Design a protein with these regions (language model features):
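Short active-site neighborhood of thiol/selenol oxidoreductases, capturing the structured segment around
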Residues: 270-294, 300
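Structural microenvironment flanking redox-active thiols in thiol-disulfide oxidoreductases
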Residues: 295-339, 350-358
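Surface-exposed beta-loop interaction hotspot
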Residues: 116-149, 244-250, 256-258
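Central antiparallel beta-sheet cores of small beta-barrel/beta-sandwich binding domains
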Residues: 27-96, 130-132, 139-209
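N-terminal "domain-start" segment that seeds a small globular fold
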Residues: 236-273
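Thiol-/selenol-based redox modules, centered on thioredoxin-like
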Residues: 367-414
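Structural micro-motif
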Residues: 339-343, 362-372
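Bacterial Sec-dependent N-terminal signal peptides
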Residues: 1-30
Length: 414
């Protein structure tokens, strides 16, 4: 009897050890993830949709925001622990696999100045982004909306909402002076709007009430534990933002310019170097933490490949954290994931004053990205604030055409 008990105990220990080293599985198919953003005393749930695909023991996760598909290949499972490493940016999800269709953990955001953790959970075999019922929408808000953020406050600013609504489904974005809020997707139920975006840097939630066919009120925008703002909007098909080419200009007396910085391997770099001498050059003021900079870099990577043999160069001037080594790692990941072959430099710590110290020929600085176009003599021909990315649809297509036409014009000049 004692021998039998001892044998059973050994078998139990043996199978327990085997089980401890066994990877947990994830359910394939549609999932609904939720990031909880605590702002003051309020908990805001930011939902997003993703799918899971398994290839033996390897998983690929695809995050969906309207037309955007973000393929995440760095998915690590160890026992019942899951780590999802976002492409391009450094954000991560760390979770415990409670069951094949259930996760709980945290979303870790690595910002330009600080990092923070937010609670996260997810459920498999769920397709809906928002759980708010199927009440028939009272209004269709497709169109262009002049939007005031923090209305009536001293820090009030203007953005433009562009929405497409079909039944209860809504998608769109907001244009701003620094670019756009990328791909938003959500639901209209009754007189209420809910839209969100999670893309590896943004964790955005927009919600509001539709007062009537031309007025949106009681809007709340949440982006982080320290970012919550009110917004209202009126429908205006003629709404426009300030001209992005007139926001920042060049100080008098700067006929040609130069920059002198070190590359990521600490080698000196100047516009007088043979690589840049006599070439049309873009100076891209950016950050590896900036979603609009990602959209611009993805386009610039193609632009560079198409025109580099015709005397065209781009230099990414990255404003990051104080820590050079951490910044270098982030810049290199950003460059690698976007397959950009042009030069990226660490230009200093993020902040307006630091940008103006590095680039003293600018009259002002309004936001990332800011793009400086130089002709073959390295005279500044244009300073463009912001970048309207693919989430803006026709505005993105128009901007790409304008950039290509302007580059070709500069290349034709003697």
């Amino acid at each position: 009897m004692r021998i039998v008990k001892t044998g059973c105990l050994i078998l139990l220990i043996f199978f327990s050890v085997l089980n401890c080293g066994k990877k947990s599985k994830l359910l394939e198919g549609n999932w609904r993830g939720v990031i909880i953003i605590q702002t003051n005393s309020l908990k805001n749930e930011v939902p997003f949709s993703f799918s899971v695909l398994s290839n033996q023991d390897n998983y690929t996760i695809t995050i969906t925001n309207a037309e955007e598909k973000i393929e995440v290949k760095e998915v690590v499972i160890s026992n019942d622990s899951l780590i999802i490493k976002m492409p391009v940016f450094k954000d991560e999800i760390r979770a415990k696999i409670l069951s094949p269709d259930s996760l709980i953990g945290e979303y870790i955001h690595f910002g330009s100045r600080s990092n923070y953790n937010m609670p996260f959970y997810a459920k498999g075999n769920v397709k809906d982004r928002f759980f708010i019922g199927e009440e028939k929408p009272q209004y269709n808000i497709t169109g262009k909306w002049e939007t005031s953020v923090q209305p009536g406050e001293k820090d009030e600013y203007k953005i433009i909402g562009i929405f497409e609504q079909q039944g209860t489904y809504i998608k769109g974005t907001f244009l701003s002076t620094s670019g756009d809020f990328r791909f938003l997707e959500g639901t209209v139920s009754g007189n209420k709007i809910f839209m969100s975006c999670v893309d590896g840097s943004h964790t955005l939630l927009f919600k509001a009430d539709i007062k009537d066919s031309t007025t949106i009120e009681n809007g709340i925008l949440v982006g982080s534990p320290n970012w919550q703002e009110k917004w209202v909007a009126v429908k205006n098909p003629n709404a426009e933002l300030p001209n992005p080419e007139s926001e920042v200009t060049v100080r008098p007396g700067y006929h040609t310019i130069d920059i002198r910085l070190n590359d990521l391997n600490n080698n000196p770099l100047s516009l007088e170097d043979e690589r840049y001498k006599g070439k049309v050059t873009i100076l891209q003021v950016m950050g590896s933490w900036c979603p609009n900079c990602m959209d611009e870099t993805r386009f610039f990577a193609q632009l560079y490949d198409n025109y580099k043999d015709r005397g065209f160069e781009i230099i990414g001037l990255c404003f990051e954290s104080k820590d050079f080594l951490q910044s270098k790692q982030r810049i290199e990941k950003f460059k690698h994931d976007l397959q950009a072959k042009y030069e990226f430099l660490y230009a200093g710590e993020v902040g307006k004053n630091n940008v103006l110290t590095t680039l003293p020929f600018l009259t002002d600085f309004k936001g990332y990205p800011t793009t400086i176009y130089l002709d073959k003599k390295h005279s500044v021909r244009k300073v463009y604030t912001g970048f309207s990315g693919p989430g803006t649809g026709k505005y993105y297509d128009k901007l790409k055409s304008e950039i290509i036409n302007f580059i070709e014009k500069l290349l034709r000049e003697q």
